[in-house]
Amino acid sequence: MSYVDAFYESGKDTVTVVERVNGERIIKDVKPEHNFYYGDPNGKHKSIFGEPVTEVRCNSQKDFKKNLGICKHNGLYESDIRPVQKVLERDYLNIDPPKLQTAFFDIEVDFDPTRGYSTPEDAFSPITSIGIYLQWMDAMICLAVPPKTLTWEQAHEVASPLSEVKLFRTEKEMLDVFLSVIEDADVLSGWNSESYDIPYVINRIIRTMGKSETRRMCLLKKLPKERKFTLYGKETQSFDLVGRVHLDYLELYRKYNYEERHSYRLDYIGEMEVGEKKVVYEGSLDRLYNHDFLKFLEYNIQDVMLLDKMDKKLQFIDLANIIAHENTVLLPVTMGAVATTEQAIINEAHRRGMVVPDKAKGERERDTAAGAFVATPKKGYHEWVGSMDLNSLYPSVFRALNMAPETIVGQLRLDYTEEEIANAQKLEKRSFADAWHGKFGTNEFEFVK
C-alpha cells in the first residue's frame, strides 16, 4: 500500500489519495489533520529550538483558520504545512514505494505551409501521430492519421509491416483512443514533454473534443491545472495533471545525471546512454510524413523506445519514486530541492519529538532594486579572474580562462611550486592552505605566460 498522487479538496475537506496496490489502482478519501502549535511558556511540546509550545487540534478547516487568528500573535508552528503533507507523513512514512505503471509518449505534429509549425500555446496544426509505450505491459502502440498523399487503403498497406501501428481517419478519433490507452497509467513521461507534448496534446483535445475531455488526462474527472513558467526568458504554458503524474524525462535527466552534457537533444543523449539514435531521414519531417510514411512511423516509434531503453538503464523514475516516499512528498515535488528537503527536516523533527516553526514570510521579496550597473569590460589579459556562474561552471571556465580540452598544448611539471610549498610547510611551519596565500596559480604558469 502506497501512494501515487494525492490532492486536497477544500469543499469536502478531504485528501484524496491515489494508490497502486498489487497492480490495482485504489482511490480513497482521507480525513486530514487540522492542527498547529503556538508559543506557550507552559506548553508540553518542544520546538526544534527548545521553546515550549502548545498544540491546537481542530475538527475542520474553518475552525483551523479561526483558531489561527486567535493564536497568531504568540508565534505559530506547523500552521503552514499543507493537509496533503500531513496525511502522507501520518499514513505513508516508512512504507515502500509502489511499482508505478509508466507510459512513455511522443507526439508528431503537422506542418502548415503558410503559417509554419505551431506552438503548444497556439496549437493550430493537428497531431499526426502519437507513440506510446506501456512499460508495465511491455507494449508499444503507435496511433497515426495518414497523410493526404495516401488513400486509406494505401496507408494501411504502407503501415502493414509495423504491427504496433493503428491508423485513424481523424485526429479526434486518435486522441480519443490515446486517452483510453493511458487510462491505467500512473505516470506519463516524454522528452521535453513539460513544455511541448503535454500542453500541445491538451490544447488539441480542447480544440477537437472540448475542454471537458481534458479531464481524461487526470483522474476523478478533474481538469488539468494550467501553469505558466519562464523558459529561456520566455513565458511558457504547461499543465499539471491531477491523480496521474507527469514527469518530463528531459528534466529528470538534467537533475539526476551526474555530469553536464554538451547537448540535451534526445538523439545525442540516446546515443550517449544506450548507443542508439533517432531514425535518420533526409529533408524535413513534413516531407518524411507525406512521402515516406513508413519511415515516419518508425521515427515516432524509435523516439518512444529510446525513452524506455534509457529508463531501463538509468531508472530515474524509480529514483524519483524512492526519494518521494523516503520523504513523504509527491512525485512532482522531487523535481525541485527545497520542498523535499523541508519535508525531510519536518519528518526528522517529528521523529525526535519536536515541532518546526512556520516559514518566515517573504519580507525580502517586497524589497526591489531600481536597477543595476553593468561595467564595460576592459579588453586584454587579466589576472585574478573570478566567476559566480556556478550553474554553468564548465562553460564559464571556457570563456574566462580559456581552459578546455582542445586548448591543452602540453603539461608542466610542478617542481618549483611543489618545492616552494614544501619549504613553507617545513621551514616556516605554515599550513598547506597558508602556504598558498597570495598565489593565484603555480610558478610554472607564471613562467610560461
Segments predicted by a language model, with ranges:
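Common nucleic-acid-contacting/processivity interface regions adjacent to the catalytic cores
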Residues: R287-L414, E418-E419, N423
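Short glycine-rich phosphate-binding loop at a beta-alpha junction
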Residues: D186-E194
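Active-site-proximal helix-loop-helix substrate-binding element of RNase H-like nuclease domains
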Residues: A139-L143, T149-V165, R169, L188, ...
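Conserved catalytic core of nucleic-acid polymerases
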Residues: C71, Y77-D80, L390-L393, M403-A404, ...
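Short helix/loop capping segments that flank catalytic or ligand/cofactor-binding pockets
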Residues: D112-R115, I141-C142, I198-P199, K255-N257, ...
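Non-catalytic nucleic-acid-binding interfaces of large nucleic-acid enzymes and RNP effectors
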Residues: M1-R82, E183, R207-D240, G275, ...
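Conserved RNase H-like, two-metal-ion catalytic cores of nucleic-acid enzymes
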Residues: Y3-K46, Q85, E89-V187
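Short secondary-structure boundary/capping segments
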Residues: T119-E121, P199-S212, A324-H325, A400-T407
